[in-house]
Regions:
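Extended, well-ordered protein cores
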Residues: 2-162, 178-184, 191, 219, ...
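Extended charged low-complexity segments that act as oligomerization/scaffolding linkers
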Residues: 183, 187, 193-196, 201-209
Length: 622
């Protein structure tokens, strides 16, 4: 990762024909971290320096596209409005340039002379971060930054914070004095961070700077700055600026969207046709397609007109503007993707007659699934091969990425691009589906509905509190079906982590829950190998799965935090859980789709006072 050159150096990044300048390397991160942790717009600390990761604008050539391989996932690309995705540049060993970064924050302090000012006023050498008045003492980037819920980012206004009571000369930062920052050492609180100025104003501490209205009370408004985008003009912004710690997770949260590669897009043919797809779409007859393929794929028999016709038909079927999809009402395009995956997981895709390039193999177990009937579990499916693409759509600041609307998502580029950063993982898993008639009968119980309604109310309140406009807050997805399946997936992952040798962090859940779906996929997937070697798939055999379910449900009947856990009216963040804690139902957050909320193990096993709320009560009493 490399910062921009000094101001006086001649930079030709804006010229698409000009080569990228060779700049000093500042560090390296894993490819997956460029999507989940250090993506576009995030702050990254390298040694004693701090940078913001540049955007993906093609005109500014911030990303080395020749080092960012193209990956295809047609269904997800169509929903996100791009043509394809790109892997982030490779690691330090193989990358020549990588991703560029820009220095941020720009305000620094010197630990020796305690001077606090913009970095240019220290007059450091090119690409250095030192105080020239203190024998090249390394400078310390500001611990505090300012952000708003629309994603804007700026330096903390130290001048206005210090001169709050002397606005005549200090509001514009022209008092003529020299500011300094020191630490009293009395405590680790903000009260020990002291700001002073040689102009004589009373010194102040940073205490109170994190209050929601601390900056607006001083007349500070968001300037709409986007330092991760080169040349981005300041936007008009109505959001209130907030003070944040530079290393806080609230400074940057990714908005990730993912999809599984399923037939007919999973056999590698779509990748071969990517450059020709727009042309193939324009043809209206099979004969035109055959003539074009003979010229474009001379000598390649794997690309047939029948296969192309099948892909074109599938694309029309998946079109969100189709009448069948329009009738779905408020169903989001991402939920449509889940429904397509659910249908394919239920129907399967056998290994026979499939080539080595097939990325989705899903088959039923050979043994009799009758042993699972007491659990209300339909025939499981063994996903022996899968590929998932996870794309970075945008990012948010301050607001939770799941509770904020798209209007608060910060863009990755100044101008629209035809690609997005993404990573692909491959692995295997087990798909479990519950009998919907059993679920519907169980969900009609007033006791079950009351427990879930309390979760839903608390979750709705939390989403409204986090949203800038409560009217725009998303609606909680909590339903008896979702909470049950979500909790069951958690206890099953915990069981496999104890019995099958997989750490819980190596397994992930993928939920399929609405009025038309009732299942979940538990899978393991990695970006640097072809997944595991059948260890997860083996857990899906009916005999093993029945043993694991029985053991997991037995464990769920008792928690080391009981009776407090099972009797809790609410628990978790915002009261969005009931009987669930880290000792019984919670997972590492990388394994959970809902950040460990909307969980209630009482819906699995019941409570001592009312066993009837448990979906699996009959199995446990048998």
């Amino acid at each position: 990762m490399t910062p921009p050159p000094a101001r006086r150096s001649r930079r030709t990044d804006g010229d698409s024909a000009a080569p990228r300048l060779a700049l000093p390397r500042r560090g390296s991160v894993r490819r997956s971290q460029m999507i989940t942790t250090y993506g576009v717009g995030s702050l990254i600390a390298v040694d004693n320096e701090s940078f913001v990761v540049s955007g993906i604008d093609d005109a500014h050539r911030s990303w080395a596209l020749d080092e960012a391989p193209i990956i295809h996932e047609h269904r997800l690309a169509r929903v996100l409005g791009v043509k394809h995705f790109r892997l982030p540049p490779a690691s330090e060993d193989t990358s020549k340039d990588g991703v560029r970064v820009r220095r941020f924050p720009l305000w620094h302090s010197c630990p020796s002379c305690q001077c606090l000012q913009h970095i240019r006023d220290f007059n450091p050498p090119t690409n250095k971060n030192v105080c020239t008045d203190c024998d090249d003492e390394p400078l310390v980037p500001s611990r505090f930054v300012v952000a708003c819920e629309d994603g804007h980012l700026d330096d903390f206004p130290y001048w206005k914070w210090l001169h709050r009571k002397n606005r005549e000369d200090g509001a514009t930062g022209r008092c003529g004095g020299q500011m300094s920052m020191r630490f009293s050492g009395r405590s680790a609180s903000l009260r020990s961070v002291i700001i002073s100025c040689t102009c004589g104003v009373p010194e102040v501490s940073m205490e109170g700077s994190f209050r929601r209205s601390a900056l607006t009370d001083l007349g500070v408004r968001c300037e709409g700055r986007r330092p991760w985008l080169k040349g981005a003009p300041a936007e008009f912004c109505r959001q209130a600026p907030r003070t944040l710690q530079r290393g806080s997770s609230s400074v940057w949260q990714p908005v990730l969207k993912s999809a599984l590669s399923i037939p007919p897009w999973s056999d590698g043919l779509a990748a071969k046709l990517s450059e020709h797809w727009e042309t193939l779409r324009s043809f209206s007859s099979r004969m035109e397609i055959e003539i074009y393929l003979k010229g474009a794929f001379r000598g390649d028999d794997s690309v047939t007109a029948d296969a192309v016709m099948e892909l074109l038909a599938a694309e029309q079927e998946e079109d969100p503007d189709r009448e069948s999809n329009a009738d779905a009402g408020a169903v989001s395009p991402y939920q449509v993707l889940r429904r397509q995956e659910y249908e394919r997981l239920c129907s399967g895709n056998a290994l026979r007659d499939k080539g080595r390039e097939e990325q989705f193999i899903c088959e039923p177990p050979v043994s009799n699934p009758a042993v699972l009937e007491p659990f209300g579990v339909a025939r499981p499916m063994l996903v022996k091969r899968l590929r998932e693409v996870r794309a970075l759509k945008a990012f948010t600041r301050i607001a939770d990425a799941e509770s904020s609307s798209e209007s608060h998502e910060a863009a990755l580029s100044l101008t629209p691009t035809d690609w997005l950063p993404a990573m692909e993982v491959s692995g295997e898993g087990v798909f479990v589906r519950l009998d919907e008639s059993w679920l519907d009968e169980w969900a009609e119980s007033p006791a079950v509905a009351a427990r879930v309604e309390q979760l839903r109310t608390n979750h709705d309140r939390m989403l409204q509190e986090r949203a800038t406009d409560p009217a725009e807050a998303p609606v909680s997805p909590a339903t008896p079906r979702l909470v049950l399946l979500h909790t069951l997936a958690h206890v099953l992952i915990n069981e496999w982590s104890l019995d099958a040798g997989y750490p819980a962090a190596a397994l992930r859940e993928r939920l399929y829950t609405d009025d038309t779906m009732a299942g979940f996929l538990i899978y393991t997937a990695t970006s640097d190998s072809a997944g595991s070697l059948g260890g997860v798939v083996a857990q899906g055999e009916p005999d093993r799965l029945a043993e694991a379910l029985h053991s997991a449900l037995r464990r769920a009947t008792w928690c080391s935090a009981d009776p407090l856990c099972i009797e809790a009216g609410t628990s978790g963040i915002g009261g969005a859980n009931r009987a669930a804690c880290h000792a019984c139902a919670m997972l590492p957050e990388t394994s959970c789709e809902y950040n460990n909320i909307l969980l209630d193990r009482a819906l699995l096993v019941g409570t001592p006072e009312d066993p009837s709320v448990g979906f699996f009560r009959q199995v446990l009493t048998a």
